[in-house]
């Protein structure tokens, strides 16, 4: 995985122009190299590597929800099969808009940025699996470009005219979080109020359904009895008045 996953990144059209200028510089230096020693040629190649080192830096944009994802026309979150080789990734036919696959069960989400029709950026976890769904700590980038190629054996990067040469370099750098690939966070299930729950437990204990039903009936009877007694107490003074008035009438 470590060898096949070594990629190099190319920035968008702005970087392509800077790359072409590097290529022009390299071609203009060729006559001097033919006259001078091989050592000087090697130093020129190292200078070229230093000049394009800035193009190897890439930073992902944060994508928080599927709605934000739709707004970002050049940023796509996709899932790739585990153990996919660099060559297989470079042969991906993404077209103008890669398909977005969102699955909640898998936390490993990869970000593809399409720089042009022939340039695709892929962020992958490193060989130790040093990757979380919120932050890519170390990533790999692969891009196809006709302008620069890297000699994997020597590590020297030189301009080339060959079309769509895959460049591979291991990028040891930090990326910004890409956020949640699933969408808006799901609301936690509402738990019953602790007070009500405790009160029910205190009242019921380990009682069976029948016992609870009987208790309920008894409570209803007690309530009815209490209401009757209250009513009787309220009606007692009225009854006394009625008795007194009836006695007066008889007299």
From Swiss-Prot:
Gene3D superfamilies linked: 6.20.250.70
Residues recorded as bearing Phosphoserine in the entry: 13
Gene Ontology CC annotations of this record: nucleus; RNA polymerase I complex
Pfam families cross-referenced by the UniProt entry: RNA_polI_A34
Regions of compositional bias (Polar residues) in chain numbering: 34-46
Biased composition (Basic residues): 238-251
GO biological process: transcription by RNA polymerase I
Major location (coarse): nucleus
Biased composition (Basic and acidic residues): 23-32, 190-201, 212-237
Signal peptide positions (record): none
Cellular localisation: Nucleus, Nucleolus
UniProt keyword annotations, A-Z: DNA-directed RNA polymerase, Nucleus, Phosphoprotein, Transcription
Region (Disordered): 1-66, 163-251
Residue stretches of biased makeup (Acidic residues): 8-17
Entry function: DNA-dependent RNA polymerase catalyzes the transcription of DNA into RNA using the four ribonucleoside triphosphates as substrates. Component of RNA polymerase I which synthesizes ribosomal RNA precursors.
Subunit structure as annotated in this protein's UniProt entry: Component of the RNA polymerase I (Pol I) complex.
Record family assignment: Belongs to the eukaryotic RPA34 RNA polymerase subunit family.
The name this protein goes by in its record: DNA-directed RNA polymerase I subunit rpa34
Lineage, uppermost ranks: Eukaryota, Fungi, Dikarya, Ascomycota, Taphrinomycotina
